[in-house]
Curated annotation (Swiss-Prot):
CDD domains: CDP-ME_synthetase. Its EC number is 2.7.7.60. The record marks R164, K222 as: Positions MEP for the nucleophilic attack. Pathway: Isoprenoid biosynthesis; isopentenyl diphosphate biosynthesis via DXP pathway; isopentenyl diphosphate from 1-deoxy-D-xylulose 5-phosphate: step 2/6. This is 2-C-methyl-D-erythritol 4-phosphate cytidylyltransferase. Belongs to the IspD/TarI cytidylyltransferase family. IspD subfamily. The lineage of its organism: Bacteria, Pseudomonadati, Chlorobiota, Chlorobiia, Chlorobiales. The gene is ispD.
Length: 240
């Protein structure tokens, strides 16, 4: 069983309020860039054989040098991302498909992960690969701690309260059988249809394949706002 991982690392951190369009993946946690921790997890995952990174054009050489100096041998390609996250993932998928076009050359699974989620564990990655191959698709998540409400037709008022026991906060890496993800992205590109995560594409184009839930703890956070930095430092220390 083997998988290729796509790391989406093109975000410029608008909500992080970083000057000059600096990438949040390059912020340091525990003395290393966020994306260093991300790449190390996939380097240590036994089921992952290759890693593709989509990033800003200005960061391509920097990330290639970082991977080389850290000894991350699984990093095969660092390419320019697209306008939207989905475009960045599609750029990588096309490269994977072109490079593994022979009969039987596709990996068993493709994983898509946010570059700004540095604390996924290698054993969790391997579990997601296994469940993706078994079920077709597998997405990690955890249960919300807060009550979730709809916003009403009047955006200043709540509309309804959702049943919290039926909700999950979705994370990455999201895993899929390779052919399924490639086909879903290809069809979405043809239609010009965009979603906020890759699982939504598979749900749309492969409705007969329910997406498997893989429940994680609360360590697999995404670095998004300034308040996440001290939380990330605490998680890093706890995981040492």
């Amino acid at each position: 069983m083997n998988a290729i991982a796509i790391i989406a690392a093109s975000g410029i951190g608008k909500r992080m309020q970083l000057p000059g369009g600096r990438s949040k993946q390059l912020l340091e946690i525990g003395g290393f860039p966020v994306i260093h921790h991300t790449l190390k997890a996939f380097e240590d995952a036994s089921q992952v054989t290759e890693v593709y990174i989509a990033t800003k054009a200005d960061n391509i050489d920097l990330l290639q040098d970082m991977a080389r100096s850290a000894g991350f041998r699984k990093v095969r390609h660092v390419i320019e991302g697209g306008k939207e996250r989905q475009d960045s993932v599609w750029n990588c998928i096309r490269m994977i498909s072109d490079g593994h076009s022979g009969a039987g050359e596709l990996p068993d699974a493709i994983l898509v992960h946010d570059g700004a989620r540095p604390f996924i564990r290698p054993e969790e990655i391997d579990d997601i690969v296994r469940l993706s191959v078994e079920s077709g698709a597998c997405v990690p998540g955890n249960r919300p701690k807060d009550t979730i409400k709809y916003i009403g037709s009047d955006p200043s008022c709540f509309g309804a309260t959702l049943e919290r026991s039926r909700l999950m906060q979705v994370q990455t890496p999201q895993g899929f059988r390779a052919g399924m993800l490639i086909d879903a992205h290809h069809r979405a590109a043809e239609e010009g249809w965009y979603a906020t995560d890759d699982a939504a594409l598979v749900e749309r184009y492969f409705p007969d394949y329910p997406v498997r839930i893989y429940e994680t703890g609360y360590h697999n956070i995404k670095i998004t706002t300034p308040e996440d930095i001290p939380v990330a430092e605490a998680i890093y220390q706890a995981l040492l």
